[in-house]
């Protein structure tokens, strides 16, 4: 890409790379979801039009293997391509360095999303772990493990799941407590994984940015997204929201850009209508 003299040539390489990355993500993670949506639409059209052939369309999911961490390393590869295109980092000299950046294991399961310009410079430095960093890394791993296994899993198995599975068996207050319990469960689960990833990386001589900053202390939705899953929200802002025009093209366009960003952010979390609605609600709130 950098060897191409033409500006349009470089853009073409970027577009091709994005199509490959997003195409693979779309196939592995969203193909069955799209087929299910299309089957439901066809069935409804058949019912409305009285077409029995459309009504008889059934959805059978394909057995597609979902690569571990595909949502995270796809965003990492996209950040590398765009940062090189924008001139924020120099292209890697060796392919093995790129493979190392994409496949570095601590964050692949649940983040944080590691950006090329933050991680790649660390590759060329000799990893040195001081006593303080070793203690900090070990503390983060243990805290993350405690959040995940002791708090999140316990709340899920012994409280939240029971209420969500049979809400009519419980009072309104108990259902409300179940909602708050789920909020605590999802925070401890997600931030626990992030803490462990950051701690393991630190023990190996690499530093990741903080991914959660007491999000439930936020006073507004905007502040919440500055504190919750920081690596994702900042990635969406820098590589999607700003690329769409951000707030530079008027109030209506700003609202549209926010809604698109949050819709895609919700879809990134999972292939289901509930995640799309969740993203839409946050987009409207922002």
Predicted regions and their residues:
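Membrane-embedded transmembrane alpha-helical bundles that form the catalytic cores
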Residues: 1-286
């Amino acid at each position: 890409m950098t060897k191409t003299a033409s500006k349009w040539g470089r853009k073409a390489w970027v577009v091709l790379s994005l199509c490959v990355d997003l195409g693979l993500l779309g196939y592995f993670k969203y193909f069955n979801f799209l087929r299910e949506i299309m089957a439901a639409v066809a069935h409804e059209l058949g019912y409305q039009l009285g077409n029995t052939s459309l009504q008889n369309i059934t959805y059978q999911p394909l057995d597609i293997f979902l690569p571990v961490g595909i949502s995270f390393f796809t965003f990492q590869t996209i950040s590398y391509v765009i940062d090189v295109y924008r001139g924020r980092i120099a292209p890697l000299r060796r392919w093995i360095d790129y493979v190392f950046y994409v496949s570095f294991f601590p964050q692949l399961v649940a983040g944080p999303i590691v950006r090329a310009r933050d991680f790649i410079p660390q590759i060329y430095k000799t990893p040195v772990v001081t006593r303080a960093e070793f203690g900090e890394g070990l503390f983060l791993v243990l805290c993350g493990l405690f959040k995940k296994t002791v708090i999140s899993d316990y709340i899920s198995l012994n409280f939240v799941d029971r209420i969500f599975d049979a809400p009519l068996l419980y009072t309104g207050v108990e259902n409300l407590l179940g909602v708050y319990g789920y909020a605590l469960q999802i925070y401890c689960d997600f931030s626990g994984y992030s803490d462990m990833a950051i701690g393991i990386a630190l023990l190996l001589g690499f530093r990741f940015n903080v991914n959660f900053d007491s999000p439930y202390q936020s006073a507004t939705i905007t502040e919440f997204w500055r504190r919750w899953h920081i690596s994702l929200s900042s990635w969406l802002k820098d590589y999607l929201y700003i690329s769409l025009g951000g707030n530079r093209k008027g109030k209506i366009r700003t609202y549209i850009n926010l809604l698109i960003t949050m819709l895609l952010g919700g879809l990134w979390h999972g292939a289901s209508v509930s995640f799309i609605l969740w993203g839409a609600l946050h987009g409207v709130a922002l």
